Curated annotation (Swiss-Prot):
Organism in which the protein naturally occurs: Scolopendra dehaani (Thai centipede)
Any one cellular-component term (Gene Ontology): extracellular region
Cellular localization per UniProt: Secreted
SUPFAM superfamilies in the cross-refs: PR-1-like (SSF55797)
Protein name: Scoloptoxin SSD558
Species lineage: Eukaryota, Metazoa, Ecdysozoa, Arthropoda, Myriapoda
Tissue expression profile of the protein: Expressed by the venom gland.
Major location (coarse): secreted
InterPro entries, sorted: Allrgn_V5/Tpx1_CS, CAP_dom, CAP_sf, CRISP-related, V5_allergen-like
Amino acid sequence: MNILLPSTLFVLLMFQIIGSGMGCDMKVRGLDANMKKMILDLHNKKRQIVANGQQSGQPSAANMKELHWNDEIAANAQRSAETCVFEHTAKSLRKTTKYSYLGENIYKGSYPDPIPRSVNAWYDEVKDVTPAVVKSFSSGGPMIGHYTQMVWANTEALDCGLVTASDRNSYLFCQYGPGGNYRSQPIYKQGPPASDCKNGKSSKYPGLCN
């Protein structure tokens, strides 16, 4: 029979409280269907702009995939959001049965529109991305990793988790499978839009691949 000392029991209870998503007083928890659609559309439209060469300073993409929502990843992201801690999820926890590594973008803010505000903020890092970085990713310099994960060509799955706490701060965690931002690898293949699609072209977002 194992006996827990009072201090050990206290730590265990605190772990259970925080780990179960009770680390803060949540007023809003999770995403409804419209919010999921908004996040997915915003991401795919940004990817489409880049793939079609419509983003100033960025080459067009031959192999950028359309993103699809993945509920298994979404459960991971929601658990992370419910900690109400503005820190990246440990890499050991960012994986699913299909993806051994998930990329992650996170946001914290007290504005009433966290979804468009966060996605636009991540995308705005494009101003510091050069064609040389597109050809061979490197992170030494201005912060660009949120943008580059958003447009990483081989990423095909997206999910997000959302919490709004009683202090009006929203925590949005988005995870991407497979994750990107690998040093010295291309963000995407430069070339005519959707000219190197392995499984056909997207019908919903011309310029992206299936």
